[in-house]
Each structure stands twice: as C-alpha cells, then as structure tokens.
C-alpha cells in the first residue's frame, strides 16, 4: 500500500482537537471523512502532534496508507475539494509519496510551536480566538531572558498537565525565544517532543514574568520545584500554533 505524507493547515477553533473522539468534531475525523468520500476507504491518519481543542496548525504533518497508487497532486486536490464542500476549516497544503518506513509521529526529529500574545488595551477583533489577549504591558525582553533558564534537559513536571500520560517528565528543550513586534509578543519553542500542556504552561508562566509578578529566579524555582502547583496559569489554547515538524530524509 503506498504511503503519503500530508502537510496540513487548520483553524482549531471549531474542533475538539486533532485526535478523533466519540463525542465532538476532530480534525483527524474530518480529514478521514474527506478521504472516504474521495477513495471510499475507511482509513486512519497518524499525525506528528495531537493538538488540543482550539489549537491551530500551519504545518501539521500526517501520514496515511491508501489501497490505490494515486498521484500526490490528485490526492491533495480531491481531499481539499471534499473539505471545502463540508465547510471544514482545514487545508491540505502538500501531499507527497513516501516510504513505508516514514512515520509522521515517530520519525519526527523536532517539533516547532508558536504562541501569540496580543498585548494591547483594546479587545481583539481580527485576532479573536487567534491570539491570547493580555492588556497589561509585557516586558518581552525580561520574558526572553527568563525563558533561557528552561533550555536543555530538565524534569518538567511543573509544566505538564496532571493528566499527562508521558512515561517520563524529562524533556530536552532546544529553543525558547520571546520577541515583540508592535503589539504582538511571540514565543517560539522547539524540542523533539513535548509534554501535555507544556508549551501553554510556559506561555502562562512567562506572562507572569512579563507583567513583573515573577522574576527569572522565580521561574527557575518553579522549574526546580517539580510540582504542578508551582506553575503559573496555563495560557489559553487559541494562541498556540504548530508551525513545523522536522524529519531526517530520505526514508
């Protein structure tokens, strides 16, 4: 069976997350339904990141096996046509044939996320449900400086959800940058893999630094506490975007 690698963009607002669920409309289920209308197959997509409800993606990666050897362009255009007809907020940006050794989740070498904070007094209109609205002025430089304390390998128990199913809380953080562009404060974070709610926990805790309630030492103390109760607030899902997944090629 030929295997296809998909690059997917979606607005996470109307979905219960990536993963198909019995109750609620999921991104995975919507794409699988579009495939069924295209080729008549009941199939299962595997993705690099199982994003939560409300989280967006500009470059999610998934793979799927099809019974027939379709052209990659045909797959992209046909599935997109069915997604449009179903009024889904999902776009298949690219499809390419790959080998059966490629796995969107387990072959990934790095995942890249963006968290957007719209920092202004006026409420959001265009960016509503696309960024976290924070009214109090944020010191992005202080946030960035504090964020560097989190780089490297650590036990990130403080920054993971209590229901996280990962076997170990130890992860290696490769990048955590905070920058400001006008009213927009952006946090970019990269690692091979993440714990449940880890990025949103970083964003919420760094916001505490940005408004002056925490110092960089406070953030480090929270990390070293290895206690979920030491975390700042968990930032809302709609500011979070999966923006890239890296792989080692060829397969």
UniProtKB/Swiss-Prot annotation:
Homology family? Belongs to the tRNA pseudouridine synthase TruA family.
- Give the quaternary structure: Homodimer.
GO BP term (any one): tRNA pseudouridine synthesis
Functionally, this protein is described as follows:
Formation of pseudouridine at positions 38, 39 and 40 in the anticodon stem and loop of transfer RNAs.
State where substrate binds: 113
InterPro entries, per database record: PsdUridine_synth_cat_dom_sf (IPR020103), PsdUridine_synth_TruA (IPR001406), PsdUridine_synth_TruA_a/b_dom (IPR020097), PsdUridine_synth_TruA_C (IPR020095), TruA/RsuA/RluB/E/F_N (IPR020094)
Could you tell me what reaction this enzyme catalyses? uridine(38/39/40) in tRNA = pseudouridine(38/39/40) in tRNA
UniProt name for this protein:
tRNA pseudouridine synthase A
Q: Where is the active site?
A: 52 (nucleophile)
- According to its UniProt record, this protein's enzyme class is isomerase
UniProt keyword annotation of rRNA-binding present: no
Q: Which organism is it from?
A: Brucella canis (strain ATCC 23365 / NCTC 10854 / RM-666)
Check the record and name the NCBIfam families matching this protein. hisT_truA
For this chain, one GO molecular function annotation is:
RNA binding
Which gene name does the record give? truA
> What keywords appear on the UniProt entry?
Isomerase, tRNA processing
Tell me which EC number(s) this protein carries. Answer: 5.4.99.12
